[in-house]
Amino acid sequence: VSGSVLLQWIPALFAFFFGFSMTAHIMALLFVVICLVLLYVFYHPATAVSSTAPTNDYRQLLRRNYAFLLLAGGTFVLFCILLSTHTILPKDDGLHVGQCTYGDLQMHLGIITSIANQQTFPPYYSISPWDKLCYPFLCDSISSSIYLFGASLRYAYMLPMYFAFFQV
């Protein structure tokens, strides 16, 4: 979860100064790297004298949770299949989406492309160009970041969902 928060907020903080651009994202990356280096240098956890936890016995952990891992893995595969077959499929007669994404998808795709293309922060609403966006758009800013770095709109929309699935 903290990774998603970092992907949303750190580029957003630098976007106030540099716009929602590659420069803001590179500055955000440098900020996170500096924080990690400082944490590595100055953080010294107290070592425990004795530990009752098993030491790296992953086989036993897998055996005890085999049914759960099998069900979770199968559910993730089903989620991936459904997401990839319901999200912006190019066909001969246009773009197709699944019924479950038919209503909300257009708004989110508009927000994703607006944030990446406008490179202003906070972004303007693409339907009413002189109005600031009054919607919780940071959830779409991760997809905007991926889209800004050259991914297709389809994959920029889907990739954060795969990681969000594991956070639930």
Model-derived regions: residue spans:
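Membrane-entry segments of alpha-helical transmembrane domains in multi-pass membrane proteins
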Residues: 1-2, 18-29, 66, 126-131, ...
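Internal/C-terminal transmembrane anchor helices
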Residues: 61-82
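Active-site lumenal/periplasmic loops and adjacent helix-entry segments of GT-C-fold
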Residues: 76-168
